[in-house]
Amino acid sequence: MRILIPFKANNPKSRLSSILSEEERKELARLMLLDVIDAAKPFGEIKVVCPSELDVEGVEVVVDTSDLNTTVNKVMDEAPLAVIMSDLPLLSEEVLKRFFETEGDVVVAPGRKGGTNMLLVRKRGFRVSYHFGSFFKHLEMARKMGMKAKIFDSFYSSVDIDDESDLLELMMHGSGKKSYEFLRKIGFSVSFEETPRLERRVFMQP
């Protein structure tokens, strides 16, 4: 199985800029990518596509400055192909095993906000259209092409890290992940007084 992981290295996760510095966001993005790679390694040949040079041990990195849709559609005819987003740190081998075992010409794993977090295409001819409710667009596209589409439903694949509420999910469910350990290291924790909420400890300079 070919596995494509798109990755944005420059100014990643801008919606977290109110609680993370640019350097912290870059490191979080890098570690989430490594978490995804760790989960996906047993299932096939991984290729990371990025608009700039990137050093990731053990996987092929391709530099492509095109937009996401153009980048992914360039390789869609290499089906069977899986496209997995790089900001899904809660993924595990168990979750991906179930994903890859799901029958269908097209398997779509939705995000919590209507996006497509993972996509598995087993037939040539399919084209992606990310952003703006892509989950529904991909299901409709498969239907129009006469392809059998299946929805893969998993909490752990639905959590893509974009804002503070997503970080809360990572801190509650991501123990053992590289990204989780990084957030703990820079002072993040979860308060369980009444409604769970994200907290950050401030380290005083000596």
UniProtKB/Swiss-Prot annotation:
Name under which the protein is recorded: 2-phospho-L-lactate guanylyltransferase
Reaction(s) catalysed by this chain's protein: (2S)-2-phospholactate + GTP + H(+) = (2S)-lactyl-2-diphospho-5'-guanosine + diphosphate
Keyword Nucleotide-binding listed: yes
Organismal lineage: Archaea, Methanobacteriati, Methanobacteriota, Archaeoglobi, Archaeoglobales
Record's function text: Guanylyltransferase that catalyzes the activation of (2S)-2-phospholactate (2-PL) as (2S)-lactyl-2-diphospho-5'-guanosine, via the condensation of 2-PL with GTP. It is involved in the biosynthesis of coenzyme F420, a hydride carrier cofactor.
Entry similarity comment: Belongs to the CofC family.
GO terms assigned for molecular function: GTP binding; phospholactate guanylyltransferase activity
A Pfam family per the record: CofC
Keyword Transcription: no
InterPro entries noted in UniProt: CofC, Nucleotide-diphossugar_trans
Listed pathway(s): Cofactor biosynthesis; coenzyme F420 biosynthesis
Source organism: Archaeoglobus fulgidus (strain ATCC 49558 / DSM 4304 / JCM 9628 / NBRC 100126 / VC-16)
Quaternary structure and partners: Homodimer.
EC number(s) reported in the record: 2.7.7.68
Keywords for the protein's UniProt record, in alphabetical order: GTP-binding, Nucleotide-binding, Nucleotidyltransferase, Transferase
GO process terms (BP): F420-0 metabolic process
